[in-house]
Amino acid sequence: MIIIRHEQPEDASRIREVNELAFGQPAEADLVETLRQTGADSVSLVAEDDGVVGHILFTSVVVESAGQRVLGMGLAPMAVLPDRQRQGIGSQLVRRGLDILRERGCPFVVVVGHPAFYPRFGFEPASSHGLACQWEGVPDAAFMVLVLDAHAMAGVSGLAKYKDEFNEVA
C-alpha cells in the first residue's frame, strides 16, 4: 500500500536516489538538494511502499502582473523509481500535493511537463491564462497551469518565474 507523506530529514538520500534513477542523471537530484539547503518555500512529498519509491516537489513561483506580484507554486521535479512507474504513484503524489496547496490557499500551480499526463489533474496550457514560461524553447503545450483560486488570478498575466536555482539545471 502506497503512503504519501511529507519528506523527513532521513529521506534525503533516498530522494536523491529516486530522482537520479528516474531521470538518469544527477541534475534534478542536485536541484532538490540545493532547494532544500536554501530553505526554499516548498512542499516536498514522498511515496512510500516499503521504502521511498517516489518524490514530488513544489516550490514558489512568482508572476509579476500590472505592478503586483502573485505568488504560486511550481511542480518540479516529480520522480518515481523506473520499476514502479505506470502504477499510479505519480498521480497519487500530484493529487496529494495539489490538495495541500489548495488547503494553503495557493492561487495557482505551474508545471513544465508532459501534455498527456498533467491535464488529468486540471492543468491547461498556461498561455490560455496569459502566463508565459521564463525559459525559451518550452513548447506551449508543455507549460501548463492549474488555477486554484480564480478570484486571485483574475486579470493576472505575465512571466512565471521559478526560483533562480532552476536556471542551474542542465
Q: Model segments located where?
A:
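Short amphipathic alpha-helix that is part of the acyltransferase structural core
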Residues: M1-E33, T38-V53, G74, F143, ...
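Short acidic (Asp/Glu) patches
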Residues: T59, L93, G97, P125-G130
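A conserved beta-turn-beta hairpin within the catalytic core of GNAT-like acetyltransferases
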Residues: V62-G74, Q85
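Conserved glycine-rich acetyl-CoA-binding loop
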Residues: R69, L81-Q92, E103-R104, R120-F121
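Conserved acetyl-CoA-binding loop-helix of GNAT-fold acetyltransferases
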Residues: L75, V80, R86-D99, V111
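Accessory recognition modules or surfaces
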Residues: R86-Q87, S91, E136-D149
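Conserved active-site alpha-helix within GNAT-family acetyltransferase domains
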Residues: E103-P107, V112-V138
